[in-house]
């Protein structure tokens, strides 16, 4: 995506904002309001988590304790309150296998790795959306990690005792974060299903979050399909009743199909998106926003890197993304009723493994063909809301 490419690429497949248009797409704009639309919160101005912990600090260490699992510390934080005081959970270097639930209504929690790098603290498990509830029980609660009366018991039971044929995408997450004001810092979350399955649809989420004012800093989030799901508490039919704001900064995200997706208002800054071909999934997509049709903004990606492995750049090319027409499998896309994903990728670098002529694909779920927007119609519901500004090609 050199300057020459930007000037000659057809606007019918690659819509580019003007300078005046791009000036309105800022972090402040994306974070101007949040929470329930019936009584929204005001602007959010996140700052990096750099100061030493204040208030309660719970120590997690798999060898010494006092908490040997992350969930034990989360349970203690939820049980002891108060609801408005931040709880810091310090996680010692090591590998922690198991699911972590941060239930709705929990106090503000900061989970942070105490190692020198995010690789030093690793939360992991192999989960597949195709698992039966019985398989989920065996993977998640084989040793009684979750018990009646635990703060997360209801969340666990909702999946394990559902009676459904498959657990579904959200339940495949290694970390499920459903409270507001969560901060995750300096650690790795890995759904280790990875390349142990075929290239068909195997949603395997590393992190699911639907709270407001969520901060993700210096994380490594690794999976294949559906690595990071940034959702909201709105119903999936397409109209927003709730806005979840998420700031993703200085992170590494890895996957193959729709691996950053959802309905949140999210800003990504200095993030490395790495697309892999190792599972043989074929065409790859990074972003898959499902922005409610009545919200003007979804994903803002700025000053980021998009890279691919050696399987791309010859006959196979990755795409920057596609819209996710969430909830419209039976009806097809319906303007003014179906979600219409919004994303702007700006001031970022793509390697040669990406499609520079048609970076946006047909919508997930419905197969709706990509239709580029033009100046003056960026939020029209009969076109896609996927655009770029001042990106370039490099290593």
Regions inferred by a protein language model and the residue ranges of each:
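Sequence-level preference for short, compositionally simple segments enriched
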Residues: 2-395
């Amino acid at each position: 995506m050199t300057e020459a490419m930007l000037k000659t690429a057809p606007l019918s497949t690659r819509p580019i904002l003007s300078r005046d248009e791009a000036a309105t797409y800022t972090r402040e704009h994306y974070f101007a309001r949040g929470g329930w639309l019936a009584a929204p919160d005001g602007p959010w101005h996140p700052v990096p988590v750099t100061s030493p912990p204040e208030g309660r600090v719970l120590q997690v260490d798999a060898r010494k304790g006092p908490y040997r699992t992350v969930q034990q510390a989360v349970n203690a934080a939820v049980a002891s309150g108060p609801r408005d005081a931040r709880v810091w959970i310090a996680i010692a270097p090591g590998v922690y296998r198991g699911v972590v639930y941060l239930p709705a209504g929990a106090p503000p929690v900061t989970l942070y790795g105490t190692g020198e790098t995010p690789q030093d603290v690793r939360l992991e498990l192999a989960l597949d959306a195709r698992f039966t509830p019985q398989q989920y029980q065996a993977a998640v609660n084989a040793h009684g990690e979750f018990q009646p009366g635990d703060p997360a018991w209801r969340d666990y039971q909702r999946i394990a005792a559902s009676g459904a044929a498959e657990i579904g995408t959200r339940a495949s997450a290694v970390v499920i974060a459903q409270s507001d004001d969560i901060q995750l810092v300096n650690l790795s979350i890995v759904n280790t299903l990875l390349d142990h399955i075929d290239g068909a649809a195997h949603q395997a989420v590393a992190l699911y979050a639907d709270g407001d004012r969520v901060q993700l800093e210096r994380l490594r989030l690794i999976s294949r399909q559906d690595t990071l799901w940034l959702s909201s508490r709105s119903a999936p039919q397409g109209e927003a009743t709730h806005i979840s704001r998420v700031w993703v900064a200085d992170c590494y995200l890895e996957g193959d199909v729709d691996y950053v997706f959802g309905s949140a208002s999210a800003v990504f800054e200095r993030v490395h998106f790495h697309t892999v071909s190792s599972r043989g999934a074929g065409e790859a997509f990074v972003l898959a926003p499902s922005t409610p049709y009545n919200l003007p903004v979804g994903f803002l990606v700025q000053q980021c890197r998009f890279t691919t492995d050696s399987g791309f750049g010859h006959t196979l090319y990755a795409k920057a993304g596609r819209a996710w027409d969430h909830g419209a499998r039976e009806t097809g896309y319906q303007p003014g009723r179906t979600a219409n994903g919004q994303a702007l990728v700006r001031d970022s670098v793509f390697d040669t493994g990406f499609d520079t002529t048609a970076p946006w694909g047909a919508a997930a779920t419905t197969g709706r063909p990509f239709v580029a927007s033009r100046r003056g119609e960026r939020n029209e519901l009969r076109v896609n809301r996927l655009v770029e500004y001042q990106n370039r090609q490099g290593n």
